[in-house]
Amino acid sequence: MIAIVDYGVGNLRSVYKAFEAVALPMQIPVDIVDAPADFTRWRAVVLPGQGAFGDSVNNLRRQGFETPLLEAVQAGLPLLGICVGMQLLFDESEEMGQHEGLHIIPGAVRRFPDGMRDPATAPANGLTHTLRVPQIGWNQLHLRRFDPLLADIPDGAHAYFAHSYYCDAAAPDAILATTDYGIDYPSIVRWRNAWGIQPHPEKSHTIGLRILANFMAMVARGCQGEEGEGAEAGPLDMPSVR
């Protein structure tokens, strides 16, 4: 079984429906967990999130989820953080003040710099336009390292993003994929048995569902995050919409 943590923020239902869509052919139950529990009763944990880092981490702690989450990671349970859920895995965030994260993945969450330029839009005169913050829309995933989470994901695949802050990973080996939005930043990471994905898989159509299916395939095979222990996710029985 996979536990999706409900700590009162964001995109819970859409993430649940996306997991449900890929879980059915694998016959892996997906539960929404809205109270602190011993997560080792499940085979993996998903931490979704949408909104401000400070509100999210405060909700998580206020509802008593921090300790059981850390104990689950320490026990080797696979953990997947999505969007703000990914950011919470890092040490700290500078979003609207300084906030302490869960210290699962080394690094910090930082705001996109002001005045970023997009060289890809330069007209003949060489001028570029200023990129807007937040980044909202489709952008590419540039694969940097092999990982079973990214099986069958082509380099340059498009995913859907909506965020003003990015994860600055302290360990280069943690970076699985990067995305260019004025700066080249980590968009998919992994540290031991914890993974994080900045784009919204539930909004990223076939690519997003493939990433979730890959995660579930690893869980089904009993993978606890060892490199190279991938599992075949199988074909996705759903229309390609991008």
Locate each region found by the language model.
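N-terminal beta1-alpha1 cap of cysteine-dependent amidohydrolase-like domains
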Residues: 1-78, 84, 90, 103, ...
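Histidine-centered divalent metal-coordination motifs
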Residues: 83, 163, 200
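C-terminal and late-domain segments of enzyme folds
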Residues: 156, 166-242
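Short beta->alpha junction loops/turns
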Residues: 8, 62, 146, 182, ...
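Pocket-forming structural segment of enzyme catalytic cores
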Residues: 92-181
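A residue-level structural signature of the nucleotidyltransferase/glycosyltransferase Rossmann-like core
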Residues: 44, 78-79, 101-102, 133, ...
